Structures are given as structure tokens and as C-alpha cells.
């Protein structure tokens, strides 16, 4: 392939990973264009926000990097798509007693959909990000493998990628360790080489999702009852959006023993509390399942699966069901299987796919 003429649009957040991704692709001979996705919603909030991946300083950092490595740079507006597919979804899920994963939604609907559409409209061949994952082509099919840096691997949030998207996506950081990426940034004189990684949800800098939803929809967030599994009232909660399955801290209720959120009932506006054993389970059903090495699961398959980002995958068997659903049976009990979160499947370092826990 003559990549000299191949153009790539790099999503630049102002952080070290996407900055080095742009540099590496330029070094490989691509014609690189940098872009920051404008997703912030109202200007006051945006101006006050500092250091997140969608703050003014992030745009300034990305622009400075683009100038330094000698590539054109643009700010592209994805405000409406982000509000609809990420923020509204995020709020709706919490209102329904589920715990959403906004990064999974953003990857699915914004970075590898709206952003890719924009690139193609502009006649650009590829999009690229600073994600830690490896995309390879094998037997006429694109596959995704875990990155070289186990601690930074981001495949958990990439299970929705389609063959169409994978064919047009580059992730050069996947073959490096984070320390090497920082070293490259330092070597080429990027000020962001020691910029700390953003941990929070980009549109909720203080990580208080309950407060965020309450501020926007005060009438929808109502107090209700904490109950036990038999329905006996234990106390008052401040609104179901403040809680997630497995939560123990911040319940503001003293019952003489550790209690955990074991269920949330949006219809009765109740938060069910129980003990640690009530949180342990070996089975779940997932919907909206996407597979990467193949189109559909035909028969039960042994995999390693994980139900949260930072977890080490556990042995499980996945069994196909109707309507793009899958049953997941773990060998060992899992703690706090949470509706709305993603379950993701692997075979060694190969990403098999994933879905949303029902």
C-alpha cells in the first residue's frame, strides 16, 4: 500500500496519547490532520472547566502540539450528537436504575461514527485515536488485540467496533507502553509529555453524577425509601440516580452492619440494600452484543469475561440467545453485576466482543 497519499484525521484531546499518535502517524508517512471534537454543551460550564479532555486548555494543548509537529488543526462541532448519544443516554440510564458507561457510548456513537463520517465526507481515508489497543487484519477480517501495556489497555470500551470502522481506524499507541509514549513526547519536545491522565467522566469533572443529574433535572430526582429484600423500609435515600449496584459508601444510613446496594427499583423509587453475599452471582444476560472476529455466535464458547473496566477477566461460557442477546455463565462468583454496564469477552489477548448487562 502506498500510504504517502493516505490521509488520516486524528482525534486530539490535548493529552499525551493522542498527541503522540499524531506524531507517529506522520512519521509513518501519512498525511495527518488534527482535530479536537467540540462536545461541551454550554459556554459558561466549558470556560469554567479546566484540564478535562474537552476543556479550553485541552484545545490549546492540542493546537500547540499540532503546530509543533507541523500538521493542520481544526475544532469540529459534535455538540448535538454528544448530547443525544452520550449525555441524554447517561441521564436516562440512571433514571431507569441502571449504571451507564459513557465512554463506551462515546466510542460507539461519536469517535468511531460521527467523527468517522466527518472524515469520510472530507475525503479522508482513516481516523485515528490515542487508544491503547491493536487492530490487525487476519484472514480478510479485522481483529482487535489487547495493547502492549496491560495496565493501559482500552479494549474494554472498544467492543462495539464494526468491520467497516476497523478498516478505517488506526491506533498507533497500542504497540507501545505508556512510559514509552511519554518518552517519545518528551524527546520531541511536547509540553504534554507529563500531563496527567484524565480519570473522570469528561462532562462531569468532579465525578459526582448524582449532583450533575439533580442540577439539570431537579424535579425528576426525588427522595425515596431504602428497603431490604423483603420490602421493609430501612430509611430514606436522596434519589436513585445517586446509587449504583455494589455501593457501600455514601449511603448515609446506620444499620449496625455493612450494607450494600443490591438492586434499584425505578418504578417504586426504591433502593434495595443487602449484604455482601447478595451481590455475588455467576450468571448474567447481555443485550446489544457485538462480535469482532466473527459476525454471530453460533454455539456456546469458552471465553474470559469481565464486567468492569479495571477487572482481570474471569473464565466464563457465553451462549447465544435470541435478539442479539447472550447468556454469560462465570466459573467463579462475580461481585456486583451491574445493569447498564458492559460485559466484554476475550480469548487470551484477542477481543471477542461484548454487550450491555440487562
UniProtKB/Swiss-Prot annotation:
Signal peptide: none
Cellular component, GO annotation: cytoplasm
Chain's role: Catalyzes the 2-thiolation of uridine at the wobble position (U34) of tRNA, leading to the formation of s(2)U34.
Keyword Disulfide bond: yes
Positions of region (Interaction with tRNA): 152-154, 308-309
GO biological process: tRNA wobble position uridine thiolation
Swiss-Prot/TrEMBL keywords: ATP-binding, Cytoplasm, Disulfide bond, Nucleotide-binding, RNA-binding, Transferase, tRNA processing, tRNA-binding
EC number per UniProt: 2.8.1.13
Name of a matching Pfam family: tRNA_Me_trans_M
Main subcellular location: cytoplasm
Family listed: Belongs to the MnmA/TRMU family.
Site description Interaction with tRNA, residues in chain: 131, 341
Catalytic activity reported: S-sulfanyl-L-cysteinyl-[protein] + uridine(34) in tRNA + AH2 + ATP = 2-thiouridine(34) in tRNA + L-cysteinyl-[protein] + A + AMP + diphosphate + H(+)
Subcellular location: Cytoplasm
Keyword ATP-binding part of the UniProt annotation: yes
Binding-site residues, ATP: 11-18, 37, 130
Entry protein name: tRNA-specific 2-thiouridylase MnmA 2
InterPro entries: MnmA-like, MnmA-like_C, MnmA-like_central, MnmA-like_central_sf, Rossmann-like_a/b/a_fold
Disulphides: 106-202
Active site: 106, 202
Organism of provenance: Clostridium tetani (strain Massachusetts / E88)
GO molecular function: ATP binding; tRNA binding; tRNA-uridine 2-sulfurtransferase activity
